[in-house]
A protein has these predicted regions:
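Metal-cofactor-binding active-site regions of metalloenzymes
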Residues: 2-150
Length: 150
């Protein structure tokens, strides 16, 4: 017999979503590698709050893999946050990660999975389909050009 929370989750999981506030690049809306995803302010601000210096990941010409390695030196400190649970679920559901924990010992597995998956021609469509996002409304600057995307 299903619990009330299971029944509610199943019903909520059927809802098509509309993202009413997004900062994605409309000309390249899907992440292209793990540094792109973990470079989002949710993760960088939490890593900064746990001791990472801004310069550690904002160094000019820093390779993306190295940026992610440096982030993982601090992301273990945020494993009790909802943002981290989102990332782990994303790694499982979208990237095919099969583990329970992502940390300094195995982040490269996730990086390599992301590199492979995010290069697939239909990556953007896969993300939208699995996440059940139907529309995304952008948060633009007042002078951003609004051409070249739907």
């Amino acid at each position: 017999m299903k619990t009330l929370s299971q029944s509610l989750f199943e019903e909520l999981d059927q809802i098509v979503l509309i993202d009413s506030h997004s900062h994605i690049n409309p000309h390249s809306p899907a992440s292209t590698d793990l540094s792109d995803l973990l470079g989002y302010h949710y993760y960088t601000e939490l890593a900064h709050s746990s001791g990472m210096q801004r310069a550690d990941i904002e160094e000019p010409n820093l390779p993306n893999r190295e940026k992610v390695r440096r982030l993982f030196g601090f992301l273990g400190n945020i494993d009790n946050t909802v943002q981290w649970s989102w990332f782990v679920e994303l790694a499982r559901e979208l990237l095919g990660f099969e583990g329970e924990v992502i940390d300094q010992s195995n982040w490269e597995i996730v990086y390599d999975l992301a590199t492979t998956r995010m290069k697939e021609n239909d990556w953007e469509e896969q993300v939208l389909s699995k996440s059940r996002v139907e529309k995304i409304f952008l948060t633009n600057d007042f002078d951003d050009p609004l051409t070249g995307f739907n």
